[in-house]
Amino acid sequence: MYLPKHYKIVSGSGESKFPLAAFDKALRNAGIGDFNLVKVSSILPAHCMYSEEITLAPGSIIFAAYASVTITKGENGQTAVAVATAVNSDENGVIFETSSKKNLENCEILVENMCNEAMEERNRKIEKIEKSSQKIFATSEMFVSAISAVVMW
């Protein structure tokens, strides 16, 4: 069984005439545009350590818990992600992600609250909660995308 040993928290945004190209630019802006993302549910493995640099070759498969949103002219959007690590490094942590086109101020608060609840339900003490978010505003005819992710490898 494979368990990731490293994780990184990222957010980014991108703009294009095409929705998928805007998403690709958001991935590139977040620093994960040259990897093949496999979307996973929201568990951070025990002993998984934060790493500032992704040490994989371009094209590598990388696991990601992420939220994304794409908007058009006149819309606003936000993505947010949070990861809670346990005081006991033998216990797994949790990851929560969300996106919204409405409650832009609440996304980071929401993911933090979900982390707190999930760790409490598991009877785990929280060492720390790390968050990242991306707000976007579409003022032209272009599509704008945002992503917030916890990537693991």
What are these regions (language model features)?
Residues 1-153:
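Helix-coil modules at protein/domain termini and other flexible surface or pore-lining loops
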